Structure formats: structure tokens, C-alpha cells
Amino acid sequence: VGFEAPAQAEIAEAFAWYEEKSYGLGGDFLRVIAAAAEQLARNPEAFPPTRGRFRRILLRRFPYALHFELLTNHRVSVLACLHHRRSPARWPGP
């Protein structure tokens, strides 16, 4: 599972926000991201396409989703980590 630069930036932003709210909460957020990445590595096809070739996995405990693409060699590319309240039209997209 690879994380593209925009997804990494969004994760870092969310981490900082949660850590500011409560020390340690940012670490919890990163652990949930890691658990989701493990799920994607094991069985990415368990998550059906939502828009064309893009798929998403909802994070546990946090109102975020990882938007990803399943590449032809069965690699997973995480394109975005978006809060549920953000416009779904913003990402994923071509």
C-alpha cells in the first residue's frame, strides 16, 4: 500500500488537529490509518468501486475515509484521506 503526497499531507493535517485537541489522539488516528492500510493490503477488492475505478475504506472511530485505487499489479495507491464532511466531489477524481 502506497500513500500519494496529497494523502500524506491530509493525514499529517488531521494528525496535527487531533493531537492539538488531545495529546495522544493524533497517535490513535495514525494507528487507525495503519490498520486500514493492513486491511487494504490483505483484501483491497473487499471495498467496491465508488466512482469509476476509485474505492474507499471508512476509518473506524474517526470520520475519515481513505480513497484509493487498485492498480493492475494488485498494488494499492491511497490518493486521499478525506473527512466525511468534505465535498465528495473534491476527491477522488482524475
Place the predicted regions along the sequence by residue.
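Basic/aromatic recognition patch in beta-strand/loop cores that engages polyanionic ligands
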Residues: 35, 42-76
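Enriched for short, Lys/Arg-rich terminal
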Residues: 69-94
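Arg/Lys-rich, positively charged N-terminal/basic patches that mediate binding to nucleic acids
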Residues: 1-30
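Short, charge-rich, low-complexity interaction segments located
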Residues: 22, 44-51, 85-88
